[in-house]
Swiss-Prot record:
This protein's name: Uncharacterized protein YmaG
Membrane topology: Single-pass membrane protein
GO CC terms, sorted: plasma membrane
Presence of keyword Transmembrane helix: yes
Keywords per UniProt: Cell membrane, Membrane, Transmembrane, Transmembrane helix
Keyword Cell membrane: yes
Organism superkingdom: Bacteria
Regions crossing the membrane: 50-70
Species per Swiss-Prot/TrEMBL record: Bacillus subtilis (strain 168)
């Protein structure tokens, strides 16, 4: 499985698909994560670290770890700690 199979233009939106519809559980946006707040919080310096900051569900932790391990963060659009106004957290 590679990221190109799962990439869609919606992934580049600031507010992405809510609840990760259309992706297997734990991939993309994990279970109900952040109501579609951009990217699902990859750990390891991409997005919100481990999905905790701004993430209402603990699923951000598992999803972030899985996503960072399986998906190429560049293709997925992960930018290391680049703030997008007007939100105080990172996508």
């Amino acid at each position: 499985m590679n990221e190109l199979e799962h990439f869609s233009p919606e992934d580049t939106r600031i507010f992405g698909r809510p609840f990760g519809f259309g992706r297997p559980f734990g991939f993309g946006r994990p279970f109900g994560f952040g109501y579609g707040f951009g990217r699902p919080g990859f750990g390891y310096g991409f997005g919100r670290p481990f999905g905790f900051f701004g993430g209402p569900f603990i699923g951000g932790l598992a999803g972030g770890l899985i996503g960072s391990a399986l998906f190429n963060p560049y293709l997925y659009g992960g930018y290391p700690y680049y703030p997008y106004a007007p939100f105080p957290f990172y996508y």
